[in-house]
Amino acid sequence: MKKAILGKKLGMTQIFNENGRVIPVTVIEAGPCVVVQKKTEEKDGYKSIQIGFGDIREKLVNKPLKGHFAKSGVSLKRFLKEFKVDNIDEYEVGQEIKADIFAEGDRIDVSGISKGKGFQGVIRRWNAQRGPMSHGSKFHRAVGSMGASSDPSRTFKNKKMPGHMGNKNTTVLNLQVAKVIPEKNIILIKGGVPGPNKSFVSIKDTVKA
C-alpha cells in the first residue's frame, strides 16, 4: 500500500461529467492529517505509519495518549489509525498528509463504521423470506426453524437470528475518486461510503489494483 489518509464524511451530492451525465458522489473532508508515529522493521517487526486527524480538547484525552502525542511533538488528535506502507522512508513524524496525495480516477478502499439500525428481525437483518400472510397462518415474520431436534439439541453458532444491525466496521472496495479539491481538503468519491454524516472514514489505495 502506498497512500492513505483519514477524513470525515460530510454528506452526498451530485456532479456532472463531460457528457452531462449525473454522478452521485460522497463528499469527504480528507485531512490535513499528521504522522504521529513510524514503526520500522528493526524495532517493531513491520513497517507502518500511524496518522492522526481532527483536533480534540485536552480534557477528553487520557494520560497515556497525551504522552504518546507529546513524544511525537504533535498536537492532540481525535482519530488515530495505523497503515502498513511500503515506502516508509517517504514519511517523517510531524509530516502533514493532505488530500492532494490522491488524484481524479484513483481506485480506493474506504472504511468506516456503518449506520446503526438498532435491534432488527431476520427479514430486515438477513433478508429472510416472509411467511404466509393469509388467514389461518400464525407464521409471518418470525425466525422459523433454528435447528434440528434432539440431535444436536442446540442451535449452532452463527445461525442468522434477530439482533443488533449495523454499527460495524465496514469497507467498500474499489471505489473511484471523482474529483479532488486540494485547497479545501475535499475528495469527491463516486457512490456511497459507510457511516452517517460527520463520521470518520479511512481512505487508502485499493487492494484490488
UniProtKB/Swiss-Prot annotation:
Q: Name one GO biological process term.
A: translation
Annotated segments matching region Disordered: 130-154
Please name the InterPro entries in this protein's record: Ribosomal_uL3, Ribosomal_uL3_bac/org-type, Ribosomal_uL3_CS, Transl_B-barrel_sf
| A GO CC annotation given for this chain | cytosolic large ribosomal subunit
Q: Which Pfam families match?
A: Ribosomal_L3
Keywords in alphabetical order: Ribonucleoprotein, Ribosomal protein, RNA-binding, rRNA-binding
Entry GO MF terms? rRNA binding; structural constituent of ribosome
Its job:
One of the primary rRNA binding proteins, it binds directly near the 3'-end of the 23S rRNA, where it nucleates assembly of the 50S subunit.
Xref: HAMAP family = Ribosomal_uL3_B
Q: Self-association or partners: how does it assemble?
A: Part of the 50S ribosomal subunit. Forms a cluster with proteins L14 and L19.
PANTHER family attached to this UniProt entry: 50S RIBOSOMAL PROTEIN L3 (PTHR11229), LARGE RIBOSOMAL SUBUNIT PROTEIN UL3C (PTHR11229:SF16)
Q: Which family does it belong to?
A: Belongs to the universal ribosomal protein uL3 family.
* Name of the protein in its database record: Large ribosomal subunit protein uL3
**Organism, as annotated:** Clostridium kluyveri (strain ATCC 8527 / DSM 555 / NBRC 12016 / NCIMB 10680 / K1)
